[in-house]
């Protein structure tokens, strides 16, 4: 077993580094973007990677804008949402949607937060992560 200690890891090509097993088969990638934000009132980003802004599109509906565009629109997005306080609601998250301009999805994505009864809601804690090229 070896341990690698480095300040930076860089692909020899133009893409992100990939993780491979001893046979050379790819077994993983790094996230292309992630965000943790407050979805109440005017959305505010707590922390993020490759996310420049969150836009409120109505109750429980948000647009996530990437700092650097993704290579294509074939990415996967996952997330969760929660409410602070005594109620402790944990909600069904994530309807990833799209707008009418398919090419915009390389620079933005859309998400919704809904309850188990399909009502759109704003929540204090909303988190999303994006994997793909």
Labelled PLM ranges:
Residues 2-72, 116-133:
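Extracellular receptor-binding modules and their adjoining Ser/Thr/Gly/Asp/Asn-rich linkers
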Residues 8, 80-82, 97:
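Intrinsic disorder/low-complexity segments
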Residues 69-82:
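Short, surface-exposed, low-complexity cationic segments
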Residues 85-133:
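Extracellular jelly-roll beta-sandwich "head" domains, especially the C-terminal globular C1q domain
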